[in-house]
């Protein structure tokens, strides 16, 4: 048993990752499938309402296509994108020429804002973005244990970029976007919860995740399950990181009334990077030190937590200009529900440029981060490190998510999707509705599969069939819960 455990640990150890260009190409399949689904939906060929045909198409696009992108077609992402997009585009053209009916929301038509008062809206492109990320994450956490999953996509040892490294940061970034909804809701209701109430809510939400993290630790240590110590440490894991984020950020909340969250995120990143770079002793400790005490044993989880705090804060900042139904005053960098028109008499040029629509905000911040990240990649003495969540890593994660969100937002603009004309594939909607629970289910299922078979010795065909069955299981559970209106909050 110990020999097999060692083989499995060696299978995911000492890896160097791949290029950012390839990662972008492979993960772009999620955006391409969203575009393809919209093409089919607007072609007048897809059956209306919920049908078995529609669900099969949905599952094929949003689960099978993503599975193919990181297994069989891992080396041919552009070919896979073409094979998916081209038939859907032809179906769209054919449907437009042969159908006499017109869609209720003609694409390319801009819709006027009906509601004047600030409201939080459910945006199709955010659901699609987060759903695609959750599905890809769920697939990858099991696929990484099979030879069919390229080693360059698995988490790197220390320096480098990989698909799974990006997935961890993207999960935190998207959670930041989701958490900004509560901040905007309190602001719109003119509610100011006390520090103690915020701390209690953070403990309540984080406590469940901490319990799951400790439960995972117990099973890993007692069931001879493979572990990668340099990932987070001896006792630490991703659930523990997620559990501590709400509580730690509760202590930052009072400061955010005077200082924007993006400024705090910049401060955290700069101070942390200074600690890493000021002399060699810090990095030597992180890479080479013995694991002879709790702090040293879990140094990756403890130090990288600072980087994840920064990513989470940038996710919150992004939510401020994405989630509302209209531009609000200075929403580019702070939570706001104040109407720009109402404040126009005393607003300045700065107010004009920082009160933005979702697409404008994404374009502005994407451009800023793209320029800064390229400069840092060029002149920084060290490469990206998910292990330490250093500055290059946080910049990479934030830039990627902003750029891809821009792509999703543009897709909605082109196809006329909005909160009034909400069109999102059921697979994406359902996994969003119970995201954290399904992430936990995916982790548990991954453990069960690993204990029931020797994944590293599986043939390509067997690997793919097992992964397809796993995808079907998670997808069916998610849709079942969604149709029954069962929403499990952890």
Curated annotation (Swiss-Prot):
> Membrane-spanning residues where?
20-40, 55-75, 77-97, 129-149, 158-178, 200-220, 232-252, 258-278, 302-322, 357-377, 391-411, 436-456, 461-481
- Consequence of changing residue 362 to P: In gwt1-16; temperature sensitive mutant that induces a delay in export of GPI-anchored proteins
A GO-annotated cellular component? membrane
Per the record, membrane topology reads:
Multi-pass membrane protein
Q: In which pathway does it act?
A: Glycolipid biosynthesis; glycosylphosphatidylinositol-anchor biosynthesis
Instruction: Show the InterPro entries listed in the entry.
Output: PIGW/GWT1
List, in alphabetical order, the GO biological process terms annotated in this UniProt record. Answer: GPI anchor biosynthetic process
The kind of enzyme this is, by top-level EC class, is: transferase
- Keywords, ordered alphabetically: Acyltransferase, Endoplasmic reticulum, GPI-anchor biosynthesis, Membrane, Transferase, Transmembrane, Transmembrane helix
Localized where?
Endoplasmic reticulum membrane
State its Enzyme Commission number(s).
2.3.-.-
What role is this protein assigned? Probable acetyltransferase, which acetylates the inositol ring of phosphatidylinositol during biosynthesis of GPI-anchor. Acetylation during GPI-anchor biosynthesis is not essential for the subsequent mannosylation and is usually removed soon after the attachment of GPIs to proteins.
Matching PANTHER family, A to Z? PHOSPHATIDYLINOSITOL-GLYCAN BIOSYNTHESIS CLASS W PROTEIN
Task: Tell me more from the record.
Answer: Target of the antifungal compound 1-[4-butylbenzyl]isoquinoline that inhibits cell wall localization of GPI-anchored mannoproteins.
Q: Could you tell me what this protein is called?
A: GPI-anchored wall transfer protein 1
Q: Give the gene that encodes this protein.
A: GWT1
């Amino acid at each position: 048993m110990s020999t097999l455990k060692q083989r499995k640990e060696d299978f995911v150890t000492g890896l160097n990752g791949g290029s950012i260009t390839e990662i972008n190409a492979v993960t772009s399949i999620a955006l391409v499938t969203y575009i393809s689904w919209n093409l089919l939906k607007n072609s007048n060929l897809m059956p209306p309402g919920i049908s078995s045909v529609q669900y099969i198409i949905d599952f094929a696009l949003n689960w099978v296509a993503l599975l193919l992108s990181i297994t069989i077609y891992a080396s041919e992402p552009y070919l896979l994108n073409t094979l998916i997009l081209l038939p859907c585009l032809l179906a769209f053209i054919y449907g437009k020429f042969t159908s006499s009916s017109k869609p209720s929301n003609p694409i390319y038509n801009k819709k006027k804002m009906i509601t004047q008062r600030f409201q939080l809206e459910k945006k199709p492109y955010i659901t699609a973005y987060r759903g695609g990320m959750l599905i890809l994450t769920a697939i990858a956490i099991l696929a990484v244990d099979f030879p069919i999953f390229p080693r360059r996509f698995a988490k790197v040892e220390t320096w480098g970029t990989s698909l799974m490294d990006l997935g961890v940061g993207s999960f935190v970034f998207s959670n930041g976007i989701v958490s900004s909804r509560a901040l905007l809701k309190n602001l719109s209701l003119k509610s100011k919860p006390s520090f103690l109430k915020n701390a209690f809510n953070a403990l309540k939400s984080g406590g469940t995740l901490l319990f799951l993290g400790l439960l995972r630790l117990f099973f890993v240590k007692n069931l001879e399950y493979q572990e990668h110590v340099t990932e987070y440490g001896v006792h630490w894991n991703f659930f523990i990181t997620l559990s501590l984020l709400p509580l730690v950020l509760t202590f930052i909340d009072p400061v955010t009334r005077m200082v924007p969250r993006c400024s705090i995120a910049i401060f955290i990143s700069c101070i942390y990077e200074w600690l890493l770079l000021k002399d060699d002793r810090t990095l030597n400790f992180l890479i080479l030190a013995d694991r002879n005490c709790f702090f040293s044993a879990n140094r990756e989880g403890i130090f990288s937590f600072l980087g994840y705090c920064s990513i989470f804060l940038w996710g919150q900042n992004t939510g401020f200009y994405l989630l509302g139904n209209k531009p609000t005053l200075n929403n580019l960098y702070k939570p706001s529900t104040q109407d720009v028109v109402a404040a126009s008499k005393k607003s300045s040029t700065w107010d004009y440029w920082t009160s933005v629509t979702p697409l404008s905000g994404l374009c502005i911040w994407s451009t800023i981060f793209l320029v800064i990240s390229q400069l840092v990649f060029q002149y920084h003495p060290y490469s990206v490190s998910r292990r330490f969540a250093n500055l290059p890593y946080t910049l990479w994660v934030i830039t990627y998510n902003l750029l891809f969100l821009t792509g999703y937002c543009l897709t909605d603009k082109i196809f006329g999707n909005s909160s009034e004309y909400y069109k999102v594939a059921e697979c994406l909607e359902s996994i969003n509705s119970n995201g954290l629970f399904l992430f936990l289910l995916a982790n548990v299922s991954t453990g069960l599969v690993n204990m029931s078979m020797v994944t590293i010795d599986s043939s390509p065909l067997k690997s793919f069939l097992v992964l397809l069955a796993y995808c079907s299981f998670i997808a069916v559970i998610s849709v079942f819960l969604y149709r029954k209106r069962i929403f499990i909050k952890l």
